[in-house]
Amino acid sequence: MGNPFSYQGRRVVVTGAASGVGAALVELLVELDAAHITAIDRDTPAGPAHQFIRADLSTEAGVEAAAEAVDGPAQVLFANAGVAATQPTRTVLSVNFLATRRLCQRLAPRMTAGGAIVLTSSMAGTGWPNHRDDLLKLMAIDDWDEALAWFDAHPELTADSYGLSKECGQVYTLYASRELGRSGIRITSACPNPISTPLLADFRATMTDELLDWAVRQGHQGRPATAREVAQVLAFLGSDAASYLNGVNIPIDAGMQAALLTDQTD
């Protein structure tokens, strides 16, 4: 039996590959012997990807062009691109959710059985059960512009555009798992707490130092995650080692959620 953690012979696609978690993931996939890595980003990645697609994932046309440009089939899609709420609301929701969903829809038919889709979500999206019924209605709206109109009609939800975008990603992971699973494709998401990347400054600007520092203190490490630590979980979820995982949102929070659920927060 081969190494279930290996990516030998696998073709993978990574969005948001130029920096932070995406860049760390590309480096890790090279170490794990990935056969072909397609990097999608608006900026040129420094890492050793085999194909680079410059893309604006905030627009439907940009996402469609990126999907069309992917060289050949892919066994694993890492939908990792994301922006903070320092960007306009529609940009946040488009990049963090609509682009992710559309790439999944376009690339999944080109995957073979045993393929995997891994979303980078966030612990900021764990409030989705409070909006479950509304978000399930959104999942049924496939048209990009109609989905944006739905967001416009729900200002009570879009007030926290980043949190909502990550709630959408987590619900989509659940929603799509049934249909994808029947085609032999798994979908999971990883939900990190704050990560020590250049984007952290944007989160501090929108979520406040007080909230982020509190979240970090609830974990046993007492510090933000590193990009490498998050990339390692993503790589696991996309590998054969996670072959029995489908439709799950995995916390990467050093125990913060456990503390919340058991009333042990500081």
How would you label these PLM feature ranges?
Residues 2-3, 246-266:
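Short C-terminal tail/terminal secondary-structure segment
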Residues 109, 178-179, 243:
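Alpha-helical segment proximal to the catalytic Tyr-Lys
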Residues 84-85, 90, 116-182, 194-195:
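Catalytic loop of short-chain dehydrogenase/reductase
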Residues 114, 186, 245-247:
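Short, small/polar-rich loop/turn modules that mediate ligand/substrate recognition or access, typified
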Residues 102, 158-162, 167-170, 189, ...:
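C-terminal helical subdomain
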Residues 11, 18-19:
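Conserved glycine-rich cofactor-binding loop
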Residues 47-61:
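Rossmann-fold cofactor-recognition segment
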